[in-house]
Amino acid sequence: MTDALSEEQIAEFKEAFSLFDKDGDGTITTKELGTVMRSLGQNPTEAELQDMINEVDADGNGTIDFPEFLTMMARKMKETDSEEEIREAFRVFDKDGNGFISAAELRHVMTNLGEKLTDEEVDEMIREADIDGDGQVNYEEFVAMMTSK
């Protein structure tokens, strides 16, 4: 997990970690975690912080060491990336920016990707993703489709 981080990112995280490790003992408290993450441009909710701590704080002592912190940050960044990638992909399909992907928009993008689909195939793709049955795909439906694999 942490091998996906660049040396620069690791150095950045180490610096931030050290700033909040007041007594220099190599651990930060759960309370300090939110402050550290916000200083790195993340914006976790209280529930997310608690979940992250529970995931990495193996002995349940309320403190996190640097390797645990790195694992957690790598995980958090991965989630953010994939969410952003899905949003970007949706924008590519949603040509007119109305928040929906129509059959025509889907056909246009698939054709540009070199996929020659029949109208039936395009309609079938829309039907599979179209949870509320309105004949087009909204962002929530698109996310569900992209993350269901």
From Swiss-Prot:
Note: This protein has four functional calcium-binding sites.
Function: Calmodulin mediates the control of a large number of enzymes, ion channels and other proteins by Ca(2+). Among the enzymes to be stimulated by the calmodulin-Ca(2+) complex are a number of protein kinases and phosphatases.
Cellular component terms (Gene Ontology): myosin II complex
Gene Ontology terms, MF aspect: calcium ion binding
Name the UniProt record assigns to this protein: Calmodulin
PROSITE patterns hit by this protein: EF_HAND_1, EF_HAND_2
Keywords (A to Z) from UniProt: Acetylation, Calcium, Metal-binding, Methylation, Repeat
SMART domains per UniProt: EFh
Organism: Halichondria okadai (Marine sponge)
Binding site for Ca(2+) 3: D94, D96, N98, E105
PANTHER family named in the record: CALMODULIN LIKE 3, MYOSIN LIGHT CHAIN 1, 3
N-acetylthreonine: residues carrying this PTM: T2
Residues reported to bind Ca(2+) 4: D130, D132, D134, Q136, E141
InterPro entries: CALM/Myosin/TropC-like, EF-hand-dom_pair, EF_Hand_1_Ca_BS, EF_hand_dom
Residues engaged in binding Ca(2+) 2: D57, D59, N61, T63, E68
Family affiliation: Belongs to the calmodulin family.
In-chain residues carrying the UniProt-annotated modification N6,N6,N6-trimethyllysine: K116
Domain EF-hand: 8-43, 44-79, 81-116, 117-149
The keyword Membrane appears for this protein: no
Binding positions (Ca(2+) 1): D21, D23, D25, T27, E32
